[in-house]
Amino acid sequence: RIKIGLFDQLSRL
């Protein structure tokens, strides 16, 4: 999924 990738980056912050 692409939406998950976006959330993954936010979680890294």
UniProtKB/Swiss-Prot annotation:
Alphabetized UniProt keyword annotations? Amidation, Ion channel impairing toxin, Neurotoxin, Presynaptic neurotoxin, Secreted, Toxin, Voltage-gated sodium channel impairing toxin
Q: Which GO terms describe its molecular function?
A: sodium channel regulator activity; toxin activity
Which compartments does it reside in?
Secreted
Query: Which superkingdom does the taxonomy of this entry point to?
Result: Eukaryota
Q: In which tissues is it expressed?
A: Expressed by the venom gland.
Changing residue 1 to K: what effect?
Similar order of inhibition potency on different Nav isoforms; alone or
Primary residence: secreted
Cite a GO CC annotation.
host cell presynaptic membrane
Query: Anything else of interest in the record?
Result: Does not inactivate (neither slow nor steady-state components) hNav1.4/SCN4A and hNav1.5/SCN5A sodium channels, although some very small inhibitory effects are seen for the hNav1.5/SCN5A isoform.
Entry function: Inhibits sodium channel (Nav) inactivation. Shows two types of inhibitory activities on channels. Inhibition of insect DmNav1/para and hNav1.6/SCN8A shows a large increase in the steady-state current component without any increase in the slow component, whereas inhibition of hNav1.1/SCN1A, hNav1.2/SCN2A, hNav1.3/SCN3A and hNav1.7/SCN9A shows a large increase in the slow component with only a small steady-state component. Is 5-fold more potent than alpha-PMTX for inducing repetitive action potentials in lobster neuromuscular junctions.
Protein name per Swiss-Prot or TrEMBL:
Beta-pompilidotoxin
